[in-house]
Amino acid sequence: MAIAVDAMGGDRPLTVQVEAAVQAVKDFGVEVIIVGAEAQINQQLKQYSYDQQKVRVVNSTEIVEMNESPANALRQKKDSSIRVSVDLVKAGEAEAVVSAGNTGASMATAKYVLKSIEGIERPAIASIMPSIHRNHTYVLLDVGANTDCKPLYLFQFALMGDAYARTYLHLENPRVALLNVGEEEGKGYLDLKETFDLLKQSTLNFVGNIEGKAMFKDRVDVVVCDGFIGNIALKVAEGTFDFVRSILREEVQRSWLSKLGYLAMRAPFQQLRKRADYSEVGGAPLLGVNGVVIICHGSSKVHTLRNAIKHAQECAEQKLNDKIAVEVSENLEVIKQAKIMNGESI
């Protein structure tokens, strides 16, 4: 199994992606295809000792800038590192792609080249989120791929989130909830009410609505929402952690007693930081396309990208897309009903 690594995407230099790829080969035994400026990549690889049978370099001549239009990148840069990486998956030479490049371009390229899994209308980005319990994390989706979602799309997000939780979190029967303004049935706008009804009829372990304040309380394993709300929820969570960390740092400096207290509490504070650190997961998968695509922060460091490659390896090995296909097949009647609600002909 080979993982294609987009070496030219992201805010950091190519050296970061190359080192991450080499570390992943050493630590996880995975095969990698590093895509980008071949001469520069080969020059960087000379610094490392690694199994050369597990590292391949594929040249690309174009780079998609972080602020570039996804449509422009898709139309005009057919030899970009992200396009070549995705093409490798399409050709069967790689099973997954890891990129810290332009998120919009990565999504557009994956959707255009790989196409959606049969029965899935819209791919979605899923994020692994922490909870108040050390050993519990949950899936939040969509966190940015789709801003205007009909009940059909939200229902399919739930199917994909359930499959992802089974695959990556190794859960047998994930608890699925719909993010809403209240827990009671009948809350929210019409699309959410209709989505609630669809989820009740599904094979999923649907536990109802969940409010934002309860997302971190270890009550659910999959939280479903549209990409607009999901992205806000994700960014608020990240911002809240930064806020708490800044307040703690400021208060620690106020007196010698505070500094002494910090020394006594240093280990718990380090655990808090680790549990809220996205670098342990590495990246977020674009669920619903015919291939594994892991999207990383543009500022990702070596450790983060290394873990993203591991993430991609696990999803590919565990046949994530096959599990999504099974979820779809088990809920065809509900999907058919959702399409009728959507005004589509069956």
Language model features with spans:
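N-terminal charge/polar-biased segments
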Residues: 1-5, 11-15, 42-44, 48, ...
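Short, glycine-rich nucleotide/cofactor-binding loops
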Residues: 4-15, 145-155, 295-300
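Short glycine/serine/threonine-rich phosphate/pyrophosphate-binding segments
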Residues: 12-17, 79-92, 96-110, 121-126, ...
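N-terminal glycine-rich anion-binding loop in soluble enzyme alpha/beta folds
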Residues: 17-68
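Phosphate/nucleotide-donor binding subsite
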Residues: 50-94
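Glycine-rich phosphate-binding loop
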Residues: 88-107, 187, 192-198, 202-272
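Glycine-rich phosphate/nucleotide-binding loop
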Residues: 111-136, 140, 222-223, 227-340
